[in-house]
Amino acid sequence: MTMEAWDILVIGDGPAALRSAAVSAKNGAKTLLISSKALGDGGTAALEGLAAPIHEMNNRGHREDTIKSGYFLCDQDIVTTKTNMAIDEMNHLEKAGVVFSRDAKGLPMTKKGIGHSSSRIVDAGDASVRDVQQVLEEQCMKNGVVRRGDQLPIMLVSTKQKVDGVITLDMINGRFVAIQTKAVILADGGFEGIFNGTDIGYGMDLALQSGIPLRDMEFISKTPFGVTDSKLTLSSNMLGYGANLCDTSGNSISADNLVELCEAISQSSGAVIDGREMGDDKVWWQSAFR
């Protein structure tokens, strides 16, 4: 077993992990980021782009839509904080290099997403995941973050409710590594990947083993745009660009929120995305429509 010492250890390699690591290193912390998968596989966290009320006076509408779509079960303080930060996060990504789709005035183009009463979804078409991942990786490199892939977190080491470090398995070299650290950031996503063999929530497992209680485990993230018999997920933002969702008979499928849309699709004979009416906006989805 080898031993190392770092100021901050970040577990994960998606947008949340990369952003946390970059900011930590920028503020002077010696930062290590590890992922149980190969580096660059940030998952689909950025698939739907970002909801930012850039054409609204405040975040009130965004906040209310989020709470309503969550059937009033969301932590409303967290919703308020997140919707307040949305525009700043969009500005950060844009300044860092994400090329959002633009309108005729040259501003980020906003589309109306499922569950939103106003147009506030900004994205880069089917390049959203790639662009966000690439830009945040560049921020990590710029600030000196050390990143390692294929590192399986085994155990969180703590003493009297104080984190001391993490034991990991280096799957490249086949050895255990003891990492001493002042703080651990768990940002490797949830456990929803257990249904298709992708992300299974190693960070949540570490927390649970250490006696940290997990909240809201009954809420499971779900998308109605998964492709049958594959791990491919399409973005619902295509509907905002003019695509139509139909069943196999050509009848339109619609709903007020994602939960109802999932139910409508499951009750149909099958779902088809028709992109023939997208016009010039189809250029943003060249990978989805070939």
Residue map of PLM features:
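N-terminal Rossmann-like FAD-binding beta1-loop-alpha1 element of flavoenzymes
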Residues: 8-33
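Residue-level detector of alpha-helix initiation sites
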Residues: 14-15, 38, 191-192
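Glycine-rich FAD pyrophosphate-binding loop
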Residues: 26-47
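An anion/pyrophosphate-binding glycine-rich loop and adjacent beta-alpha core
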Residues: 39, 212-290
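A short alpha-helix-loop-beta-strand transition element characteristic
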Residues: 44-45, 73-80, 90-107, 213-216, ...
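Glycine-rich active-site loop/strand segments that organize a redox cofactor
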Residues: 52-82
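Conserved redox-cofactor binding core of oxidoreductases
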Residues: 92-175, 180, 187, 226-238, ...
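Glycine-rich loop(s) and the adjacent beta-strand/alpha-helix scaffold that form part
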Residues: 183-232
